[in-house]
From Swiss-Prot:
Function: Plays a role in spermiogenesis and fertilization.
Pfam family, one: Spt46
Record's protein name: Spermatogenesis-associated protein 46
Principal subcellular localization: nucleus
Compartmental location: Nucleus membrane
Keywords, sorted A to Z: Differentiation, Membrane, Nucleus, Spermatogenesis
GO BP term (any one): cell differentiation
A GO-annotated cellular component: nuclear membrane
Organism: Macaca fascicularis (Crab-eating macaque)
């Protein structure tokens, strides 16, 4: 298995006293960014400071490079939230995932609280849209056209589909081979040591780039629409080979 490495976003900031005591630091930082150095020096040379003595010209150029290197465009941000994000967060990318993640040292510097609030909003919108679609599909599958679903029944069915319980997880795993070392997710086939880990994976899978919760919601929708049909198929089938799992209806 490959080794994981954490990449730090930025190094520690340099104080103003250190810059005044060691001016060569800024020149070394400026040489590492040739575009900034090239654009900063000619602008200062073309300014009225060119008529000053050489010792004052060096001070002016030094101040111009300092202002250019510490500008907000060249850093991650000078706000208080940006400083916390730079100091406490790192970038982590697993070998099996095409996505990169922010790993923070504490909850206060979590990127979702500062620069990425749309992640939680999109997750909530996605969950609400899925629950509404499931409720509408259940209502539209009624045998008679006169029977309409009221608002209360729709809300109850929506709440039932949103909550994935331990009983639902165990019921979905009946059509899979028995696992002795843990619990297997019926959607992505990943193994987890305990049932609580599997429940948290299903609940927070959206942040990993996929959502196994959708799979379990569709299973619950099928079970709620025709529970007697699943029970009749199970009793009529004499062996497991003749029994069709509800997962085949989702494909």
């Amino acid at each position: 298995m490959e080794n994981f490495s954490l990449l730090s976003i930025s190094g520690p900031p340099i104080s103003s006293s250190a810059l005044s005591a060691f001016p060569d630091i800024m020149f070394s930082r400026a040489t590492s960014l040739p575009d900034i150095a090239k654009t900063a020096v000619p602008t200062e040379a073309s300014s009225p400071a060119q008529a000053l003595p050489p010792q004052y010209q060096s001070i002016t150029v030094r101040q111009g490079i300092q202002n250019t290197a510490l500008s907000p465009d060249c850093s991650l941000g000078d706000t208080q939230h940006g400083e916390k994000l730079r100091r406490n967060c790192t970038i982590y990318r697993p070998w099996f995932s095409p996505y990169s993640y922010f790993v923070c040292a504490d909850k206060e510097s979590h990127p979702e609280a500062y620069d990425f609030p749309e992640v939680q909003q999109d997750e909530g919108k996605w969950d609400n849209c899925l629950s509404e679609d499931m409720a509408e599909s259940i209502c539209s599958s009624s045998s008679s056209a006169e029977n309409t679903c009221p608002r209360e029944a729709t809300k109850k069915s929506r709440h039932g589909l949103d909550s994935i319980t331990s009983q639902d997880i165990l019921m979905a795993s009946r059509w899979h081979p028995a696992q002795q070392n843990g619990y297997k997710c019926a959607a992505c086939c990943r193994m987890y040591p305990t049932l609580d880990f599997l429940k948290s994976h299903i609940k927070r899978g959206f942040r990993e780039g996929f959502s196994c919760k959708v799979y379990y919601r569709k299973l619950k929708a099928l079970w709620s629409k025709e529970p007697k049909a699943w029970l009749g198929d199970r009793l009529s089938s004499g062996s497991c080979q003749a029994f069709n799992s509800p997962a085949e209806h989702l494909r």
